[in-house]
């Protein structure tokens, strides 16, 4: 059970490449305290909701305020459950699958000249990029706005789950993939 409300056993990841990297195991406390940071690829052992909470703490306003980010995420999940009548964890996983870019651009140097080259994105990076863009989209939408960050996070997750281009995460993914397409 997540937040003592949502069943984690009914959730499934549809993207076969991301199954290993999206952890939805039930946890009493979504605060590992960096327990997995010393392990290689230890973040795959962290619950994906805790990773979203950690991504929400990126800006100056939210630095170190994990309980505030926890409450924001919990309230956003309640809003998602009320609006969609579905498990909000499944909606979040669908949003992560849709918002993760499949290819991006890296820079190669040939004789002192930097040339962009299109490369495939690893599944771990896809999850990281998706979570970061969802959290960034929510904080950007709530900045200097009457909408609270709770509503903005819920909207961002629902729009990304629907693969809607008005979502910040989806628009960033499409921009990255468009640049990669031109660099082939």
From Swiss-Prot:
One of the primary rRNA binding proteins, it binds directly to 16S rRNA where it nucleates assembly of the head domain of the 30S subunit. Is located at the subunit interface close to the decoding center. The keyword rRNA-binding applies. This is Small ribosomal subunit protein uS7. Belongs to the universal ribosomal protein uS7 family. It holds the Pfam family Ribosomal_S7. PANTHER family: RIBOSOMAL PROTEIN S7. One of its GO terms (molecular function) is rRNA binding. It comes from the Archaea. Part of the 30S ribosomal subunit. It comes from Thermoplasma volcanium (strain ATCC 51530 / DSM 4299 / JCM 9571 / NBRC 15438 / GSS1). SUPFAM superfamilies: Ribosomal protein S7. Keywords: Ribonucleoprotein, Ribosomal protein, RNA-binding, rRNA-binding. GO terms for biological process: translation. One of its GO terms (cellular component) is small ribosomal subunit.
